[in-house]
From Swiss-Prot:
Protein name: DNA-directed RNA polymerase subunit beta'
Quaternary organization: The RNAP catalytic core consists of 2 alpha, 1 beta, 1 beta' and 1 omega subunit. When a sigma factor is associated with the core the holoenzyme is formed, which can initiate transcription.
Biological processes, Gene Ontology terms: DNA-templated transcription
Record: residues binding Zn(2+): C1022, C1098, C1105, C1108
Binding residue positions for Mg(2+): D541, D543, D545
Organism this protein belongs to: Metamycoplasma arthritidis (strain 158L3-1)
Gene Ontology molecular functions: DNA binding; DNA-directed RNA polymerase activity; magnesium ion binding; zinc ion binding
Keywords recorded for this protein, A-Z: DNA-directed RNA polymerase, Magnesium, Metal-binding, Nucleotidyltransferase, Transcription, Transferase, Zinc
PANTHER family, A to Z: DNA-DIRECTED RNA POLYMERASE (PTHR19376), DNA-DIRECTED RNA POLYMERASE SUBUNIT BETA (PTHR19376:SF54)
Family from the record: Belongs to the RNA polymerase beta' chain family.
Swiss-Prot/TrEMBL cofactor(s): Mg(2+); Zn(2+)
Cofactor comment text: Binds 1 Mg(2+) ion per subunit. Binds 1 Zn(2+) ion per subunit; 2 are expected compared to other organisms.
Catalysed reactions listed for this entry: RNA(n) + a ribonucleoside 5'-triphosphate = RNA(n+1) + diphosphate
Magnesium in keyword set: yes
């Protein structure tokens, strides 16, 4: 692809890796184009940059293209890179001729007159410098750690440090002398020093005098208030001994220069070994102080190792030359009225330059030490503020309006920083946005684009066409026609957009279906038209939502959009593999109305000879839509269908007019659907067998047959239609690949059209089965019609010649056939949508107040409740029950009463199915029973303010999350003032919960994406034999099945042969894909657990293999290599997060384990692996054995002392005691056998504790079960494999305890795969392997431990990541997706992961390639986008004026960024 030199001097596709290291002073000088010596920016009169200042044109490049900054001579583009020689000064300065864009990449530097410590290296991550140096503070015991304030005092010249002790015991090396204890230390040092000299000598007297002065000053008020003069004492000590005391950056420089890293490493390793040995000796229990010390030593060792391995000098952490970033990255903008607005960074640079210059003057004048010291401190502060002003709390440098200046670090971090604002989400050209409105007449793959918008989006193509068709003569002319919206252009625009696609995106982009491709259709008005069925995946509605439009430009982008992103191909949702495109609301209402059966309706029992005749009778109002009539079977379905096959001659099929109309939209080969039993059938064949009674031979009395034999069937509701759509999808979704169809079309010149069906029948489907006869017939018909169309267009029939088809014509036929074949499901869905809208209008459903039917039994129920509550109060007053009991019973009673009222209303609903409101509820179009109960029955109990609940849980009190006085009125009766007030709290809570939830859920998705972003399907089979045993996920508390076994094994591969329980026969071999049928067979055979291949046991590094992942739920086929399953997993878990409740409590009742926490807070708790879950954690058993006794120790405190009979390693039986302090129910009783890690009491398990006691498999199963439970309770189905991916990432790190002979060091956190590789190498060389333990890391920490520092830095804690990457000189090999987006490469997934599998969904080629000779095929380099730049260049040349940059471009990520104010 041609890249303009102006923008991309470095081709991003050629970047192989990115390394980060510490910049040495020489590096900074080599980057620099000159030294900045003056703090001036521009001249206030001439507005020209000052020479030697922060905007100097000689250093940073010219303000105007190709103009010499000294003499002002303007050159041509061709002179770029040469030197100006117009004047002597130009020759002397060697001024290069450059474009003004060079001001964005030319750097300068400031030569500092004294080194400065880089702020990040002593502030970030508890200070790298001090981890390296290991300092002590005077006047404190050695064990006490050095506090950050001590270090800052040293760097900011407030305290001093001993650099060399010179043999003086009072001054040990590396001792920090704080001003408060300085007098004592210096006194001791001088007293020690004086003993070295004979009394009476001059030196002795000198020291004596200094000592007396010190004692006098230290005891005076001034000395006590302000401390003593360090400098004078330092001079004396340094004069009379070898000691050396320093302060500030120079002292740090001295220490770093003289540091022996190798020796330090050995010392630290020895200390760690000592603690580890102690731990082994004492039997795995060591004091917490030792453990903390070891943690500190681990961290120190990590830093020392980083410097040793990267071979960098520690002094590089000091700044000698300060780089000045390019001028255009910190611009000075002229405002109206001659004022200027400047970037904060300029202000910070100016402070540094002013102070640096002043220091130079002081040094030249030989000023007093104190003055120079003060200036040095100010420079240090100025450079700190420039690097990271926000961290300089509590006193960052403030601007005039009292806000902290934005420093260089602030430009990197946070949502508005470089990473997230400019690198991961950019504003893009060729995009726009507008409000959406419904487009009911669109096909599913279309969307309506406003004419004016299309004119702007497709401008270059339109201009090209206008000139080609000679409508306009020049580009300028064409552009003017577009701007004036000349009516001539509209037909041309319509032609231009033919065959092009647009991408529509609705923020927040929660999953991949939030961006889909559509064919644009021009519409009038200013709103985008959206197909009603794609609202579900976009989560859009038409109450003012906006959507963004993007135009794919290159040929390749168009191909991908058409094959992978077109809306009609995205029928299934990714999270559960069920159709996400389901009709709703009016469409459901229409179909429900259409399929109602009414006994005795007008025209019942009539027999029609064909379908058209029936429709005419209905239109003439001779027969009702709901009347049951008969039609000949051939009119309705292919009589070849098994269920209808019979010897008898003429047979009729009985159903209502509406159901005939409904069934007419399906292909003739689809079974006739009579009733809603279709949802109970496991397959269409099974359903078809049950419908024989609706088929009668000729001559039967139809009216009698209907009355006697046929029950009145229910109409189709939302669930039935969803199931029917699933059947349609399974039956008609494309079973062949584009390559297969192309192969048949390639033979069109050799095979007669009538025989083409045989060629299709010979093909194999993608899962290696024979092609279904029906698909072959459909494809043959489509091929025939497309071929005839193409031949007719080329006018062959006129000459009567039989000319063979050429490659272009074959490609045209292929495009037509393939589109119509893959569009079959969508076209049926479109027909369902049209029917739904049509008949919901015809049904004329409306409702009035009289339609809300009430129950007359309600007052007696209310009275019963009131009497019961009064009695409870009496009992409580008499002291018979506690307040907690009274509350719980009250809540229970009112809940029961509401249930009774609901029961009465349900009866009413049954009796009045044709009531409009009840029709809406029954059909599933809108509303549900609980809405109706509030409308006509009673509103019931309301949620309480739950501020105090947490305390209640901790104190084991009953949680009062519900107001105990219910709202007794319904909306139809109207609420009293108190009831209205009471209900406002609950209502508002609902609204605030939703808002909070959206933000939290967005943040969760972002974290999960970061956890799993580099997981891509990379191999066919990793060969792992480590399976995962699955069985029903059962809630151990109430025995409910949360996820049945069948659902867990469909679409997975078996890891071991599966043997039936009943027949004992082998049902499936190892590595067999478990299909729906096979799964049903396994369940029928009574198999209770199956070992499957799982992501958790996959051996693929940075990814998974096809076998361990199984079926791709979105396509219902085995996953393809290149699928970015990590991101799909994150989206599938995050997207439904919004629907999880924020409620921590279920309604009322005693706080059991179930009530403590569910929903969103619990999910976060599991995914972040919290150490302190909400409420009181469960006690888990540390032993395996039998419980022999349970002593309740104290009556007041519920504490159990369990005794467990354990068989130890020596085969002896011993009794172990376990304390269970809790009021929660015990999970076990005497005589139970308990396993290690089993819960002894109710409550959430602390995951880290479980991992310590058991193994990884137990923890993985626990997490999987708990996460599934949260979603399933809310009725959200998510596939296991997605949760497995996240769990695998959480448990992918190992902490090294004993490094053996490996390259790791103790305390390092390494990736499991690196650990295994290293150990395999060591064992093969007969060396000692490393030993470590798996650790569990929450989703917050996993991305920070990523191998890629770019991915980690763009997530959180940017400065910390970059500091560690720099000291260890890390390289980023750009293996994940995020890193590649940052550097602007294609992501290594999908179509960019070469070579992709042939016949996979990513094997996308232009149609013409299937019919060309291989050498003529389109190569990758030919996928060049339209050269849009040449248009822009011509325009620029014509207009010769500055085109203002318009900020109305849309960024894909912008929208969601604003949607979720993220929490970091």
């Amino acid at each position: 692809m041609k890249k303009s030199r102006k923008y991309a001097t470095l081709d991003s596709d050629k970047i192989a890796k990115i390394s980060l290291a510490l910049a040495t002073p020489d590096d900074v000088e080599s980057w620099s184009h000159g030294e900045v010596t003056k703090p001036e920016t521009i001249n206030y009169k001439s507005y020209k940059p000052e020479r030697g200042g922060l905007f100097d044109e000689i250093i940073f490049g010219p303000m105007i293209d190709y103009r010499c900054p000294i003499c002002g001579h303007k050159y041509k583009k061709i002179n770029e890179g040469s030197f100006c020689s117009k004047t002597e000064l130009c020759k002397q300065e060697k001024v290069e001729i450059l474009p003004k864009i060079s001001r964005r990449n030319h750097m300068g530097h400031i030569k500092l007159n004294s080194p400065v410590v880089h702020f990040w290296f002593f502030k970030v991550d508890h200070s790298i410098i001090f981890k390296l140096l290991d300092l002590t503070v005077a006047g404190r015991p050695n064990t006490e750690p050095v506090r950050r304030i001590d270090l800052e005092n040293l760097i900011y010249y407030k305290s001093h440090i001993v650099l060399e002790s010179g043999g003086i015991k009072a001054l040990p090396k590396n001792l920090i002398i704080d001003i408060n204890v300085a007098a004592v230390i210096y006194k001791d040092a001088l007293e020690e020093l004086i003993t070295r000299f004979e009394p009476g000598t001059e030196d002795y007297e000198d020291i004596r005098e200094t000592l007396d002065n010190l004692i006098e000053k230290a005891s005076s008020k001034i000395g006590q208030d302000y401390g003593i003069d360090f400098y004078e004492l330092n001079e004396v000590i340094e004069h009379y001994s070898e000691a050396k005391i320093g302060t500030g950056a120079q002292a740090i420089e001295y220490l770093l220069k003289n540091l022996d890293l190798q020796k330090e490493k050995e010392l630290v390793s020895a200390k760690i070994k000592k603690i580890n040995d102690e731990e082994i000796m004492s039997g795995a229990k060591i004091a917490s102080t030792s453990r903390q010390t070891r943690e500190k030593l681990y961290k120190r060792l990590q830093v020392i190792n980083a410097f040793i391995e990267s071979k960098q000098e520690p002094t590089s952490m000091l700044i000698y030359n300060l780089p000045v970033i390019p001028a255009d990255l910190r611009p000075l903008i002229q405002l109206d009225g001659g004022r200027h607005s400047t970037s904060d960074i300029n202000e910070l640079y100016r402070r540094v330059i002013i102070r640096n210059n002043r220091l130079k003057q002081w040094q030249e004048k030989d000023a007093p030490t104190l003055v120079i010291q003060n200036e040095l401190r100010m420079i240090q502060e100025a450079v700190d503020a420039l690097i990271d002003n926000a961290r300089r709390s509590p006193n960052p440098v403030l601007s005039k309006d009292n806000r902290p200046f934005k420093s260089i670090s602030d430009a990197l971090t946070g949502k508005k920083g470089r990473f997230r604002q400019n690198l991961l989400g950019k504003r893009v050209d060729y995009s726009g946005r507008s409000v959406i409105v419904v487009g009911p007449n669109l096909k599913m793959h279309q969307c309506g684009i406003p004419r004016e918008m299309a004119a702007k989006l497709f401008e270059p193509w339109i201009i090209h066409r206008l000139i080609e068709k000679e409508v306009a003569t020049t580009i300028k002319n064409a552009k003017k026609m577009l701007e004036d919206q000349n009516p001539v252009i509209w037909p041309h625009i319509a032609e231009v957009i033919k065959g092009r696609l647009v991408l529509l995106n609705r923020a927040p982009t929660l999953h991949r279906l939030s961006i889909q491709a559509f064919e644009p259709v021009l519409v009038r008005g200013k709103a985008i038209r959206l197909h009603p069925l794609v609202c579900t995946p976009f989560n859009a509605d038409f109450d003012g939502d906006q959507m963004a439009v993007h135009v794919p430009i290159s040929e390749r982008a168009l191909l991908e959009s058409r094959e992978l992103m077109l809306a009609n191909k995205n029928i299934l949702g990714t999270k559960d593999g069920e159709p996400i495109i389901n009709p709703s609301q009016d469409m459901i209402l229409g179909i429900y109305y259409l399929t109602i059966e009414e006994p005795g309706a007008l025209g019942e029992g009539r027999i029609f000879d064909n379908y058209e005749h029936m429709i005419r009778a209905y239109e003439a109002k001779k027969v009702s839509l709901h009347a049951r009539v008969a039609l000949p079977i051939e009119e309705v379905k292919n009589s070849k269908i098994k269920a209808f096959a019979s010897r008898e001659s003429q047979r009729y099929i009985i159903s209502t007019v509406g159901k005939f109309i409904f069934n007419n939209i399906f292909p003739k080969s689809f079974p006739f659907i009579f009733d809603n039993k279709v949802t109970e059938a496991t397959s269409l064949e099974q359903y078809s067998e049950k419908v024989n009674k609706y088929i009668i031979p000729a001559g039967t009395n139809v009216i009698e047959h209907i009355k006697m034999e046929l029950p009145v069937l229910d109409a189709f509701n939302k669930k039935n239609i969803a199931k029917i759509i699933r059947y349609v999808f399974d039956k008609y979704v494309a079973a062949l690949t584009l390559q297969d169809v192309a192969g048949v079309i390639d033979q069109l010149n050799d095979v007669p059209l009538s025989n083409i069906v045989l060629n299709y029948l010979n093909l194999k489907t993608y899962d290696d089965r024979k092609v279904d006869q029906e698909h072959a017939i459909i494809l043959a018909a489509l091929t025939r019609s497309a071929t005839e169309k193409t031949k007719a267009r080329s006018q062959r029939h006129i000459e009567g010649l039989e000319v063979p088809l050429n490659a272009e014509e074959k490609a045209e036929i292929l495009d037509d056939v393939w589109f119509r074949y893959t569009n079959m499901v969508a076209s049926i869905l479109d027909d369902i949508k049209d029917l739904g809208f049509k008949y919901s209008s015809l049904s004329g459903i409306t409702f009035a107040i009289s339609d809300i039917l009430e129950t007359d039994k309600k007052p007696e129920y209310i009275a019963e409740g009131d009497a019961y509550i009064a009695q409870l109060k009496q009992y409580y007053n008499d002291g018979l029950i506690s307040d907690d009991d009274r509350y719980s019973l009250t809540i229970k009673k009112w809940t029961d009463i509401k249930a009774k009222v609901q029961g009465e209303l349900q009866q009413i609903i049954k009796e009045n199915p044709r009531n409009p409101i009840i029709t809406m509820i029954n059909s599933g179009a809108r509303g549900n029973i609980s809405n109706y109960v509030q409308l006509a029955g009673m509103r019931g109990l309301m949620a309480n303010n739950t501020k105090s609940t947490r305390a209640d849980v901790k104190n084991e009190r009953v949680v009062r999350s519900t107001v105990e006085i219910p709202v007794k009125s319904s909306f139809i009766e109207g609420l009293t003032a108190f009831e209205f007030y009471s209900s406002t709290h609950g209502t508002r809570k609902g609204a605030t919960d939703t808002a909070l939830n959206t933000a939290k859920s967005g943040y969760l998705t972002r974290r999960l994406v970061d956890v799993a972003q580099n997981i891509v399907v990379r191999k066919e089979n990793c060969g792992s034999d480590y399976g995962h045993i699955v069985r029903d996920i059962v809630d151990t508390k109430n025995g409910q099945i949360i996820v049945p076994l069948k659902e867990r094994i469909i679409g997975r591969y078996a890891n071991k042969p599966i043997i039936g329980e009943k027949t004992k026969q082998e049902l499936a071999k190892r590595n067999t894909l478990i299909t729906d049928k096979l799964a049903q067979k396994i369940i029928d055979e009574g198999v209770k657990e199956v070992e499957i291949r799982s992501v958790l046991g996959c051996n693929t590094k940075n990814g998974v293999c096809k076998m361990c992942f199984g079926k791709d739920l979105a396509t219902n086929r085995v996953v393809n290599i290149g699928e970015a399953v990590g991101i799909i997993a994150a989206q599938s878990i995050g997207e439904p997060g919004t629907q999880l409740t924020m409620r921590v409590f279920h309604t009322g009742g005693v706080a059991g384990a179930e009530d403590i926490t569910g929903g969103f807070p619990r999910l976060i708790e599991l995914i972040d692996a919290h150490e302190q879950p909400w409420g009181r954690p469960a006690v888990i058993s540390p032993y395996e054995g039998e419980i022999v006794e349970d002593l309740v120790e104290d009556k007041n405190v519920n504490s159990h002392l369990l005794t467990i009979k354990v068989v130890n390693s020596k085969k002896e039986t011993v009794n172990k005691k376990v304390h269970v302090y809790t009021t929660k129910k015990l999970r076990v009783k005497v005589g139970d056998h308990v396993k290690v890690g089993q819960k002894l009491s109710e409550g959430p398990v602390i995951v880290k504790e479980l991992l310590e006691l058991t193994d990884t498999i137990t923890v993985q199963n626990y997490l999987l079960k708990e996460i599934q439970k949260i979603y399933r309770i809310q009725g959200i189905a998510i596939s296991d494999k997605y949760i497995e991916i996240i769990i695998r990432q959480m448990m992918s790190k190992i902490v090294i305890h004993d490094p053996g002979d490996s390259k790791f060091f103790a305390g390092a956190i390494v990736d499991i795969f690196d650990y295994q590789e290293e150990n395999a190498t060591l064992l093969s060389q007969r060396k000692r392997p490393a030993f470590g333990k798996v650790v569990i890391k929450g989703a917050k920490q996993v991305p920070l431990l990523s191998d890629s520092f770019l991915a980690a830095a763009s997530y959180q804690e940017t400065s910390k990541i970059l500091v560690h990457a720099a000291i260890s000189s890390r390289s980023d090999s750009l293996s994940g997706l995020k890193e590649n987006i940052i550097v602007g490469k294609k992501i290594p997934a999908g179509t960019a992961l070469y070579p992709f599998e042939s016949h996979s969904k990513y094997d996308i080629r232009p149609s013409i390639d299937y019919f060309r000779k291989p050498e003529l095929e389109t190569s990758d380099s030919e996928f060049i986008p339209v050269d849009l730049e040449s248009y822009h260049q011509e325009l620029e040349d014509e207009q010769q004026q500055i085109i203002e940059v318009d900020d109305s471009d849309i960024s894909v990520e912008d929208e969601e960024n604003d949607f979720y104010e993220n929490e970091d």
